[in-house]
C-alpha cells in the first residue's frame, strides 16, 4: 500500500513537471501576459523599411541618434520593417545573407539600448500577394533562420508574421499557422503578432484563424479610412492617385465612422480575449496638414481609449513624422501623435 502511495506520488510529480514544462515550451506566461506586453508597446513608429542601410550602411539615413530621439519624443516602440526576400537566392534552404542580420541586429540593439520595445515585422506583402503558395517555402525558411538568430533577445522583441497578407483567408490562415509553430519552437516565451488579410483590415478580423492553447499573441490591424483622404495623390494607389483637395474635418459623422470601425475591432478583441495593436495608420503628405493633424490625433486617441498599442506609419520615407532632409521632426504630426502634457 505504501509502495502504491509512493508510486502515485512520483507519477503525480512527474505529471505536474511535464505539464509545467509543456506550458513553458508553448510560451505560457499567463493569459494576461500579452496584454501586459501590449501596454508596454504603447505608442510607436515604423522605421527603416525603405532605408538604403539594408544594402549599404554607409548610405544609412537612420542613425543611432534617431532611436534616442524617438524615445525622448515619447514613443515606446519601433516596428522594424524588414524585407528579407532580396537577401536570399532561391535555393533549398533560402540561406539569408549575413549582411541582413548585421543590419537587423544593429537596429534591434539600438532600440533596446534606448528602452524601446521592438516589433520585427516581416514586410514582404507584395511578393506574398503575387504568389502566396509559391513564396510560402521561402517565408517559412527565412522565418526559421530569423527566429533562431533572434532567440536570445529579451521579450521586449516581438515577431510579426507578415504585414498585410493580401490573399484569400483560407490560404493565409494555412500559411500563418505553419509559420507560428516555427517561431514558437525557437522562442517559447516570445509574443507573436498575427496579421489579418487584405491590408490588416478590421472587417477581416472575423476571417482570422487563431493558434490553439497559446495566449501569448497580439493581433495587428491597420487603419487608413477614409482611404480617399489618407491616400489622395499617392502614386501607388490606383484609385486615389489623381485625387486632391479632400479634407478631413472632425465632424460628428466623421468621428463616428472611426469609432464604429474601432468598436467592431474592440468587440472582436473582447470576444477572443486577445489584445490589438494598430500597426499602421497615417495620412499621405498630399493631404492638407490641418486635416492630417486632426485625423492622426483622433485615430491615435481612439486607439488609446481602447487600450490598443499603436505604431504610426512612418518615421521616414513617406507619411513622415521626421524629415531626414532637414533632420528635424515634422512637429504638427509629432504633436498630433504625442500631445504635449
State what each model feature region is.
Residues 47-62, 84-97, 230-257:
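Acidic/histidine-rich helix-loop elements
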Residues 53-58, 84-101, 123-138, 291, ...:
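Surface-exposed, active-site-proximal loop segments in enzymatic domains
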Residues 288-341:
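Aromatic-rich peripheral "rim/lid" segments of glycoside hydrolase catalytic domains that contact
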Residues 25-77, 94-95, 268-269:
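N-terminal carbohydrate-binding accessory modules
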Amino acid at each position: 500500500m505504501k509502495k502504491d502511495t509512493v508510486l502515485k506520488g512520483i507519477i503525480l510529480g512527474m505529471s505536474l513537471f511535464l505539464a509545467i514544462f509543456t506550458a513553458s515550451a508553448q510560451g505560457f506566461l499567463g493569459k494576461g501576459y500579452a496584454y501586459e506586453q501590449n501596454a508596454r508597446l504603447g505608442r510607436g513608429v515604423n522605421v527603416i523599411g525603405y532605408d538604403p542601410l539594408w544594402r549599404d550602411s554607409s548610405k544609412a539615413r537612420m542613425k543611432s541618434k534617431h532611436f534616442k530621439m524617438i524615445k525622448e519624443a515619447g514613443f515606446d516602440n519601433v516596428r522594424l520593417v524588414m524585407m528579407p526576400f532580396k537577401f536570399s537566392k532561391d535555393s533549398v534552404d533560402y540561406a539569408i545573407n549575413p549582411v541582413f542580420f548585421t543590419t537587423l541586429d544593429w537596429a534591434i540593439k539600438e532600440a533596446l539600448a534606448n528602452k524601446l520595445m521592438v516589433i520585427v515585422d516581416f514586410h514582404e506583402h507584395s511578393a506574398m500577394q503575387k504568389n502566396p503558395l509559391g513564396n510560402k517555402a521561402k517565408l517559412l525558411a527565412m522565418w526559421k533562420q530569423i527566429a533562431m538568430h533572434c532567440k536570445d533577445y529579451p521579450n521586449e522583441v516581438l515577431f510579426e508574421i507578415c504585414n498585410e497578407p493580401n490573399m484569400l483567408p483560407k490560404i493565409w490562415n494555412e500559411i500563418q499557422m505553419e509559420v507560428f509553430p516555427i517561431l514558437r519552437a525557437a522562442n517559447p516565451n516570445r509574443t507573436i503578432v498575427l496579421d489579418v488579410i487584405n491590408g490588416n483590415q478590421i472587417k477581416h478580423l472575423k476571417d482570422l484563424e487563431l493558434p490553439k492553447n497559446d495566449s501569448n499573441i497580439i493581433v495587428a490591424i491597420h487603419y487608413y479610412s477614409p482611404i480617399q483622404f489618407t491616400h489622395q495623390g499617392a502614386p501607388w494607389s490606383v484609385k486615389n492617385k489623381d485625387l486632391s483637395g479632400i479634407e478631413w474635418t472632425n465632424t460628428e459623422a466623421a468621428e463616428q465612422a472611426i469609432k464604429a470601425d474601432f468598436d467592431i475591432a474592440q468587440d472582436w478583441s473582447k470576444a477572443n480575449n486577445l489584445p490589438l495593436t494598430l500597426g499602421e495608420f497615417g495620412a499621405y503628405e498630399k493631404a492638407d496638414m490641418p486635416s492630417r493633424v486632426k485625423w492622426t490625433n483622433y485615430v491615435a486617441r481612439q486607439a488609446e481609449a481602447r487600450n490598443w498599442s499603436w505604431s504610426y506609419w512612418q518615421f521616414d520615407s513617406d507619411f513622415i513624422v521626421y524629415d531626414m532632409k532637414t533632420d528635424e521632426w515634422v512637429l504638427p504630426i509629432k504633436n498630433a501623435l504625442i500631445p504635449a502634457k
